[in-house]
Amino acid sequence: MPTAFPEDSVGLVSPQVFRFSEPLALACGRSLAEYELVVETYGELNAARSNAVLICHALSGHHHAAGYHSPNDRKPGWWDSCIGPGKPIDTNKFFVVSLNNLGGCNGSTGPSSANPATGKPYGADFPVMTVEDWVHSQARLADVLGIEQWAAVIGGSLGGMQALQWSISYPERVRHCLAIASAPKLSAQNIAFNEVARQAILTDPEFHGGHFQERGVIPKRGLMLARMVGHITYLSDDAMGEKFGRGLKSEKLNYDFHSVEFQVESYLRYQGEEFSGRFDANTYLLMTKALDYFDPAAAHDGDLARTLAVAKADFCLMSFTTDWRFSPARSREIVDALTAAKKNVCYLEIDAPQGHDAFLMPIPRYLQAFGSYMKRIEV
């Protein structure tokens, strides 16, 4: 537990709540009459309001991207390795905004929030969200903050999809777009993984059609299984082999179906158990559907270059060699489309054994490349 924070930490941070009363029309045909977004900021907004950077989170992410909420916190925010003084997203230079998206379960309005119409948790009645919906809500947040244009919009995985959507939906409001370990749309295999995870939740007897909160229960087993499946896809075979191999938890096999015998089994069960205690099942369903639905090129008969033709930002794409969830080939699809659309783009394929989760890790080559690009951004 830190008693003094590292010099390159943003230190103690406090979330802010922004309330919106103007209805937000959604892609599903419904709307949210009112909603709240939980936000953290790091660094200072300059007088010209030209140094603001938006951080978009991935599936299980949230607003707490850097720093500590308490001196007793065991861990900093989820992207602390990249945000702070002297780090790639340098808070001595940039004013950084990070939020929990609508539909999340970390304070922003979502399935676990009270439905104003009933006074009960929304549960399964919360509307399905899309990446476009999130970007529109983020644009409203920017308006409230007085930010007309982002110096950069940055995200990894699902966050990278939001960054791309920003460049399409609000081309005048983004100077640089950084999409890391991302994709222009999900493959059939990725949709399949998400469906297996959803079925694990939907078929849990404690799910109760999404209204489990009213019964005082949670679909723990379903969430555990969903997280276990997802976590396998976030790591590479090499990373799992190096970390666990075929190591046993105890010295011998038990020859039964109930014991936790292999170290990798123990790890997955721990991850599932921890996740099911902090994440909302309806939010998990919602986030995976937003991933599945993301396909901006569909508006132009699948032509991604035509879709990106409206963008005015400069782009930086990064991928990792062992990421098989969003492989380098998926980032190259975006690069090829941007090149065809005659946009400024740089692409970095980073040799890293960690798989998809590499974008969250303090890999020196990655941090150096990331920081080099961010230094080019004028504020």
Swiss-Prot record:
Residues 51-360 form the AB hydrolase-1 domain. The gene is metXS. The lineage of its organism: Bacteria, Pseudomonadati, Pseudomonadota, Gammaproteobacteria, Pseudomonadales. GO terms for biological process: homoserine metabolic process; methionine biosynthetic process. Belongs to the AB hydrolase superfamily. MetX family. The keyword Glycosyltransferase does not apply. One of its GO terms (molecular function) is homoserine O-acetyltransferase activity. GO terms for cellular component: cytoplasm. This is Homoserine O-succinyltransferase.
